[in-house]
Amino acid sequence: MGRVYATSDWHSCDFYKEVLNQLNEDDTLYFIGDAIDRGPAGIWTFNALWADKRVIMLKGNHEDMLAQYLTSEERLQGYVDVNGGDVTMQSMSGMMHEEKEWYIRTINKLPEEIVYHSPKGHNVILEHAGYSPFDMPHRSHDALWDRTHFSDEWNNGFSRDGLDPKTTYLVHGHTPVHYLKFIYGFKDKPTWTMADFREKEEFFNDDLEKMTIKPEIICYCGGHKFDIDMCTVITDRIALLDLDTFEEIYFDRENLKK
């Protein structure tokens, strides 16, 4: 029996083949969103993940934006102008209408959440952005975009039918671990809002020295939440988290491309 991993936010990196080649044939990889945009590989990173039978894909906010943009360019011009969708659209420029329709259908069918039941007896909720256990059920928008749940106390207010909070964990991406380490600090404020995040994000993004530090997975919220977003487009690093043992595995572009 192979190993079961989670990863996220590859953002059109150009070393996706090398990472997939590290997996064994009987491994399973949950990709929890944002295969596309910003990086040089365009749509091809998404295509490779989708075609790999070992990979189970979840929707990220960037996939959701792509599907909306392909449906109506006027609805979401910011996808291209602000969110790195220009690279993805360039890689799709020669595609027929039917091919683009396939992406819309495929993305819209991707799950926003999966619960992995480990044979070791614990459960792992997989979701792109993560969420607060106080907010169940939560909106689809939050599953893809939320950045307000980082100060939660896991065992207080947990509300998921059939899941014991003591043996349940949440793995998410969407927010680069740099942000949690340098912006939130986990101690600055008792609660966070998106306005708080935007206020500090503007200053943080100008500090490229912090952004290029090789990141590692952050485990927080009393050991029950894991952020696995390595900001790959800047750091050239991808993280895999073993969902049974919680072992962390890292792949760096400079090592794989030798």
Write out the residue ranges for each language-model feature:
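N-terminal active-site segment of His-dependent metallophosphoesterases
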Residues: M1-A48, D52
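Active-site neighborhood of phospho(di)ester-bond hydrolases with catalytic His/Asp-centered motifs
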Residues: A6-S8, L29-G33, M57-N61, E127, ...
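Active-site environment of divalent metal-dependent phosphoester hydrolases
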Residues: H11-F15, D37-P40, E63-A67, P133-F134, ...
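Active-site neighborhood of divalent metal-dependent phosphoester bond hydrolases
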Residues: G39-Y116, K120-N123, P133, R139-H141, ...
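Short, well-ordered beta-strand micro-motif
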Residues: V115, L126-H128, L240-D244
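A short secondary-structure junction signal
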Residues: A129, D135-H141, K181-Y184
